[in-house]
Structures are given as C-alpha cells and as structure tokens.
C-alpha cells in the first residue's frame, strides 16, 4: 500500500512559513537555500523540485519516492502568483479547495471532497508514495493519515509563523521512529521518520 509522506521544510522552531504565509524561499523570503541543499534535493528528491527549478538545474530524473503531490489552496496559490498553474507537471497533482471552482490547468485536479477519504482511496491505488506538500491546514486535516515525515530542517528560527500542523490537527500524541538522517555542511538536516506501530 502507498504511504502518505509529509515532506516539508521547517525551521528549528517548527514553522513552515512566516505569519503571512508567503513563500519563505521566494524573492522576498527569509529562508536561505545553500548549494549543498539544492544538490541534495537534485540527487535524492528530484521529483519534489518545481518545474522552473527542474528546468534551471537541467533535472530530468523521474525520482524514486513520489508520483503524486497533494497541496491545499493557499500553497497552490503561491505558485499561481508566480505564474505557475502546475508547478509539478511530472506528478499527478491534486489541490484541495472548497473555494476554487475551476482548475487553471487541466492537469491539476481540484478536490472539494474530504481529504481523508481521498487519501485513503489514493493509498489503495498502485504507484509510488504520495507527497503531502502542505500547507499546515491540509497537513492538520490529514494528521492521522501521515505515514512518514521527512523534515528538511533549516538552521534558522523565526519566532512566529505557520506551524507544521494547523489547529485542524486534533490533540493525538504519536511517536515516530527515525529511519534516516542526512546532515549537510550548511547546517540543514534531513530527518526521515516512520510512524511507530501502535
């Protein structure tokens, strides 16, 4: 069965974006992207690079982890604001929204249904694992369905912002088993956790 992986960049203090929710790596962002970080993404997670980054870096690798990406409307709108109607044309791309009524790109599937039932259906289908891109609200809604966490921890703190999970996650303590870790010279750490068995 396919797994749902929340693969996300986070600060040391657990935030995925600043208080306004804008792209922390964008033109006015606060998140530095060192060369070794980019090299690690290219070699280990090429499918998670958006199309403009893949083109700029001449990345053609299919990737071995994911063939489907899920994101909420607010995360999707960050790409739209940058002129990307489908930042991941190399993946099946689902956007969860109750307010968007028409997809700006025929390759992007809009889903107004319950995210939990949709993910349970996706897990039963053949294919590679499912990448939960974010944001925090969708991650909060899917908290109980997440099988793997891959945290790209940047060596910075911001004090306030959007946390890994929104208030939509219920209080439900879970333990996770460290499966892998990579420490980059720039100070970023990639941590892979699997949900511990009950």
Describe every region a protein language model picked out.
Residues 1-198:
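Enzymes that bind and transform nitrogen-containing heteroaromatic metabolites
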């Amino acid at each position: 069965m396919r797994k749902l992986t929340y693969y996300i960049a986070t600060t040391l203090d657990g935030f995925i974006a600043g208080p306004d929710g804008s792209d922390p790596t964008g033109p006015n962002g606060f998140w530095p992207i060192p060369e070794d970080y980019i090299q690690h993404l290219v070699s280990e997670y090429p499918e998670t690079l958006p199309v403009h980054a893949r083109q700029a870096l001449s990345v053609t690798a299919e990737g071995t982890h994911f063939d489907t990406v899920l994101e909420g409307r607010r995360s999707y709108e960050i790409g739209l604001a940058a002129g990307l109607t489908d930042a991941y044309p190399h993946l099946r791309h689902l956007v969860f929204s109750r307010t968007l009524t028409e997809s700006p790109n025929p390759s992007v599937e809009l889903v107004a249904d319950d995210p939990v039932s949709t993910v349970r259906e996706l897990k039963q289908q053949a294919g590679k694992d499912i990448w939960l891109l974010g944001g925090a609200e969708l991650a909060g809604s899917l908290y109980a369905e997440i099988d793997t966490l891959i945290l790209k921890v940047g060596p910075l703190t911001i004090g306030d912002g959007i946390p890994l999970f929104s208030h939509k996650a219920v209080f439900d303590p879970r333990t996770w088993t460290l499966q892998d870790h990579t420490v980059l010279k720039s100070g970023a750490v990639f941590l892979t956790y699997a949900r511990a068995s009950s």
